[in-house]
């Protein structure tokens, strides 16, 4: 999906907007039945959460797939919760963007910065994190670039390491920045319902 058609899809989607807990929460329903939910900081307008879900062949909703933001905490007392508690020292991979860049944080990586390398694989359209001690390896794509059919640029990629956390940054290309500005204008034109109000307006 090229950049103009992705922007048009966003504009054409049915949208509901609510202001809650200092966040502007936007729900999108696309013509193909997919749903996207985003949460923005109400003051800075920075994206905090983006997640997707779609119906199965039987019409049941699947689980939300997190694209940006921390995964939801498991319910206390469940098997999953106990399992996560045991493996809390394992690396955790989350995406948290800024206005000018896509950013990923991998916690629980204690090695020195010199151990890591972060590269672009243009053929597979992904970024790859490697360590010289072979203790960590991760391939990940940038869905925003895929949706807009924009090429990956190695020069836009950088990384830092502090407090056992590897921070990988990819500078947003101008096409993405323009798209996000246009989307913010679109969202500002939506009627926003405050928390506690019953009705939300969908456009």
UniProtKB/Swiss-Prot annotation:
Species for this entry: Xenopus tropicalis
Signal peptide residues on this chain, from the entry's feature table: none
Protein name: Protein DPCD
Family indicated by similarity: Belongs to the DPCD family.
InterPro entries per UniProt: DPCD
Entry coiled-coil feature ranges: none
């Amino acid at each position: 999906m090229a950049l103009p058609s992705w922007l048009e899809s966003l504009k054409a989607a049915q949208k509901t907007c609510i202001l809650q807990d200092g966040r502007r929460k936007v729900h999108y329903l696309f013509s193909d039945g997919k749903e996207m939910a985003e949460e923005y900081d109400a003051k800075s307008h920075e994206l905090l959460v983006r997640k997707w879900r779609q119906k199965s062949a039987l019409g049941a909703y699947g689980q939300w797939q997190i694209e940006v933001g921390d995964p939801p905490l498991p319910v206390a007392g469940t098997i999953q919760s106990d399992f996560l508690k045991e493996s809390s020292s394992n690396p955790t991979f989350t995406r948290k963007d800024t206005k000018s860049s896509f950013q990923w944080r991998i916690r629980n990586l204690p090695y020195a910065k010199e151990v890591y390398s972060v590269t672009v694989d243009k053929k597979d359209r992904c970024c790859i994190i490697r360590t010289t001690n072979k203790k960590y390896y991760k391939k990940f794509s940038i869905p925003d670039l895929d949706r807009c059919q924009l090429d990956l640029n190695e020069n836009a990629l950088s990384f830092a390491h502090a407090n056992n956390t590897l921070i990988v940054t990819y500078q947003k290309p101008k096409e993405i920045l323009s798209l996000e500005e246009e989307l913010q204008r679109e969202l500002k034109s939506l009627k926003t319902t405050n928390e506690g109000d019953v009705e939300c307006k969908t456009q």
